[in-house]
């Protein structure tokens, strides 16, 4: 019962639609009705500005981390052993993408998955975050940077032979690519939105 109860808590944490709540509470704006309509960091940044976008990113990362740490704090173990926190992190990701507070819709799972990685393996999180930031600088396309970063996490976890993380990272990578399928189409067409900085943005502006 304790395990089931905490998994429900992990799902509910992940289900918190930070982008929607921040937009409505402080900007009187429903970001689901603006920009791409997504409730995550990128659309919040685009619609409400960098401060709101940063706040939502931090909150989405935090809910993934807190959910992942639940079995450690409450001393819960499963057959996964030391990988049990990943199960809780997955429930948070599920909540984020299929939120009970958002008519079972949600975001694209990037920041919440990053929060799960932060709690489970901080060193790998730092490596992945470094790649992600570098990719954003070079491409100015958050969606592309996110998809490449997830792929790299899968490869790095494979190199370090963390099989549980490799399996989960692979599943999440496929899922993230699926959730970004419209972005992939726009990237191919050269019409994907860019953040207003970085080399990719300046290359487009110079044309």
From Swiss-Prot:
Reactions catalysed according to its record: an acyl phosphate + sn-glycerol 3-phosphate = a 1-acyl-sn-glycero-3-phosphate + phosphate
InterPro entries: G3P_acylTferase_PlsY (IPR003811)
Cell compartments where the protein resides: Cell membrane
Subunit structure: Probably interacts with PlsX.
Transmembrane segments: 3-23, 54-74, 81-101, 122-142, 158-178
Keywords: Cell membrane, Lipid biosynthesis, Lipid metabolism, Membrane, Phospholipid biosynthesis, Phospholipid metabolism, Transferase, Transmembrane, Transmembrane helix
Topology within the bilayer: Multi-pass membrane protein
Recorded superkingdom: Bacteria
Main location class: membrane
Pathway recorded for this protein: Lipid metabolism; phospholipid metabolism
Stated name of the protein: Glycerol-3-phosphate acyltransferase
GO annotations of cellular component type: plasma membrane
GO terms for MF: acyl-phosphate glycerol-3-phosphate acyltransferase activity
Native organism: Levilactobacillus brevis (strain ATCC 367 / BCRC 12310 / CIP 105137 / JCM 1170 / LMG 11437 / NCIMB 947 / NCTC 947) (Lactobacillus brevis)
Enzyme Commission number: 2.3.1.275
Keyword Phosphoprotein attached: no
Task of the protein: Catalyzes the transfer of an acyl group from acyl-phosphate (acyl-PO(4)) to glycerol-3-phosphate (G3P) to form lysophosphatidic acid (LPA). This enzyme utilizes acyl-phosphate as fatty acyl donor, but not acyl-CoA or acyl-ACP.
Family: Belongs to the PlsY family.
């Amino acid at each position: 019962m304790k395990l089931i109860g905490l998994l429900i808590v992990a799902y509910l944490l992940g289900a918190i639609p930070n982008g929607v709540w921040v937009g409505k509470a402080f900007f009187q704006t429903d970001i689901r009705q603006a920009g791409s309509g997504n409730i995550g960091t990128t659309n919040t940044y685009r619609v409400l500005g960098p401060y709101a976008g940063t706040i939502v990113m931090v909150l989405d990362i935090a809910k993934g981390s807190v959910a992942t740490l639940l079995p450690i704090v409450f001393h819960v173990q499963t057959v996964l052993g030391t990988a049990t926190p990943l199960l809780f992190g997955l429930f948070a990701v599920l909540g984020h993408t299929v939120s009970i507070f958002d008519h079972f819709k949600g975001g694209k799972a990037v920041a919440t998955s990053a929060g799960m990685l932060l709690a489970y393996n901080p060193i790998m999180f730092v490596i992945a975050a470094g790649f992600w930031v570098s990719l954003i600088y070079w491409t100015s396309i958050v969606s592309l940077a996110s998809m490449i970063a997830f792929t790299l996490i899968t490869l790095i976890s494979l190199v370090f032979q963390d099989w549980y993380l490799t399996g989960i990272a692979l599943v999440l990578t496929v899922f993230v690519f699926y959730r970004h399928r419209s972005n992939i189409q726009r990237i191919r067409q050269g019409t994907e939105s860019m953040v207003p900085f970085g080399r990719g943005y300046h290359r487009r502006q110079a044309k």
